[in-house]
Each structure stands twice: as structure tokens, then as C-alpha cells.
Amino acid sequence: MSAHGLPAPSRDDVLAMAQRPTSPSARRLAFYAAGIGLAVFVYALVVDPDRAWRAFHYNWYYFTAISSAGVTWAAVQRITTARWSRPVVRLMEGFVAFLPLAFVDLLLILFVGRSHIFPWTHTAPPNPERALYLNPTFLVARDIGLFLIIMGLGLWFVYNSLRLDIGVIPESGAAWAKGLRERMRRGFGDERREIHTTHSRNGVIAVFMVLFYAYGWSVLTWDFSLTLDMHFQSTLYGWWSFMTAWLGAILSISLLTMWFRNVMRADHLIVTKHFHDLGKLSFAFTAFWGYLTFGQYLVIWYGNMPEETHYMHLRLSAPWITITTIAAALAFLPFFGLMSKAAKVYLPTFIGFALSGLVGTYLQRYTEVYPSLYGIPKHAPLGVVEIGVGVLYLGTWGLCYLAFMAAFPKMRIVMQTSRYRDEIQVPVDPRTMEPLPAHE
């Protein structure tokens, strides 16, 4: 990825763009979606609580994994010291806004809805090892602990990033975060020193974010998806699942970048080359996701081990095969559609393929969860309840994200405008601020 060779904009110009408000209609739409979805969920709780909680669990799994992946994308930009993404990395950081609410939903799933979701709550595990792993106390403790670590690292990383901007700009933003912004300004020192300090601190945090994203979501995937079928096992399952979220995150980031470029009127900062880069990443991780999907299928199917093949056979049988086929086709379509540069930089085609990938991965999550819970029903339970709870999550995710963007600058300011912004490529002595000698 290149830095695109763009000249440094003025701080006043970037600040004006970063503080432009989003349309009130976007917040209203998210609010109405959340309200309608909540009504559907409450109605389903009364009529069919099993189906309601399973829809809640499935949508939590999809939206929370993508939110965690989105902020981890920002961590990767720090690890690689990327310059090309400086105008868009705040849009990645905004994904962290949903995680506190997702944690509350996690507690609801584990303490209120688990008997409606997980077979191991009312069926004995098939062997002592799985009984030990699925011990409720052990499972709840590790899931809550891992999620708190993942969320805490993400919030810490984004707090440091925001502080670097909040410390140099006048007070502005949503009233609910005024106290937090004031806290960020306390003790803010020399700009050059703050840049290096923040860069170094976030460099350490970013490494742990990536490690805990991979490990934490592997474990969460085992507990929230793999164990729904207590007789199935797969060593690739965790990788495959968290890479599904990784792909969904970069597709979501691409769509948000297109929208917020218009909101901020930042056409001269977020340029065609940014969409080319985002398109290349979307194409690459679609290919990698397809590789993992086919690789898992190939090994399981031709390995022909009964404890594994029944998982694939179920999803390739009626009534699930139709949804499985549609999910695979939609999720893999961006691989073919985004091969050319023209498709990446022409926004209507990019939007179409990004939406295709997101819907495909959404349905793929469905095929992860529902066949294990329902076996072979007459009809696949994909209706008003599942879609309604999906709308609930989409609306609440949108409200969290828009609240974050209303409270903080929508774009990194210091790292685009400071004359010291490129010094971070060279480590300095924290006491003297002089470059450290290079090691031959």
C-alpha cells in the first residue's frame, strides 16, 4: 500500500471536515430499525422463546465478531506503520463503539438465554473431556474474561488515538462525551513528544490486540458455534470463523469510507487510490476466506471421518442446501467482481460487491449455527424473527457507531497535519527526542 503522495492538508481544513455532522435521518433510521427489531424480539420471546434467543445469539455472533475485527484492522495499520490509511483509520476505530453493548448482550446470552440456545445445557456431552470443557462455570468465566480483554485492549487503543487529536483541537462534539474529552486533554504535553509516546504505546497494544483477536475469537467460536454440535470437531474451525469476520469488517469499512467521504466532503483526502487499496484488500481476503472454506470442506469430506462429515452432510441436505449455496455464491462473488481495477474504483460496482459479500457472510453465519440447532426440519427457520432481530442489531450497531462519530473527530487530525507525523518511522530517545542510532 502506498502513501499516495498527497500533500499535507491544513489542520483547520481537516478539523472542519472531521467535525461535519452526519445527517439526522441516518440516526432516525437506525433508531427506527432498532425499535422495530426490539419489538420483533420481544414478541418472539412471548411466542417462541427458543427461536427468539437463537436469533439473538446468531446476530450477536455476526455483528460482534465484525466489530472486534474492525477495530483490529486499525491495530494492523499501526503495526505496519501504514500511511495510506491515515484519512480512513478513524472509521476503523469507530467499530469499538459497539463492543460495550455487545458485552451486555453476551451476559444476557450466557445467563438468561443459554438454556434456549446451547444443547449442552440439557444434554450430556459425549465424553468426559468435552464435559470438562463445557462445564458452565469454566465456559462462562473464559468467555467473559476473553471478551473483556478483547474489548479492553480495543478501547485503550482507540482512547490513545483519540487523545492525540482531542489534545490539540477546541472543545466540540456530542455532550455525552464531554467529560471524556476533558479527561483526554489533562496532562497533554508537547505535540511532538505526544506523537511519539502515543505511537510507541499503541504499537505494543496493537500487537496484543491482534493476538487476542485471533486466539480469543477462536475460543469464542468454539463455544458459541462449534459446541452447538457436540459431536463435531475441526482444527480449522476457529481460523475460518474469525477470518469470516475479518472479511466482513473490511467490506464494512469500505462502505463506510464511501459514505463518510461524502459526509465530510473529503474528496481531496479520501481519493480513488484509497478505494483501490480497499478493493485490493477486499479481493484478497475474499480469496483467502474462500481458500479456508474450501480447504476445510475438502479435508473433512475426503477424510471421511463420521464425527466430521455429518456436519457438512447436514448443510448440504434439504432444507439447508439452498441457503448454503446462496451464502457461498454471494460471499465469493467479490473475488470475481473485484479482480479489475475499474471495478474497485467505480463505486457503484464496489458497493454492489461489498454488499454481496456482507449478505453472503451473514448467511454463512446462519449455516454455522442453525443446522446444528434444528437438525433436519421441514422448513429452514429463516423468517420474520431472524430478520427482525438482525434489524435490531443493525440499528443498535448504527446508533453506537454514529454516537461515536458525533462525539469525536471523524478523521485523524494530528497524523495528517503535524510536521512531525512522519518522524514515527524512526525511533527516538524518549528523554532527548533525538533519533536512536540505526543498528547495522
Annotate each language-model stretch with its function.
Residues 21-43, 136-327, 340, 418, ...:
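Long, contiguous internal "core" modules enriched in hydrophobic/ aromatic residues
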Residues 44-60, 76-89, 157-169, 228-230, ...:
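Juxtamembrane/interface segments at transmembrane-helix termini
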Residues 48-186, 206-209:
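Transmembrane-helix bundle segments that line or gate the permeation/cavity pathway
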Residues 65-75, 104-108, 143-155, 243-258, ...:
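Hydrophobic cores of alpha-helical transmembrane segments in multi-pass inner/ER membrane proteins
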Residues 235-241, 306-328, 346, 375-404:
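Membrane-interface transmembrane-helix boundary segments in multi-pass integral membrane proteins
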Residues 317-372:
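Extended, compositionally biased non-globular segments
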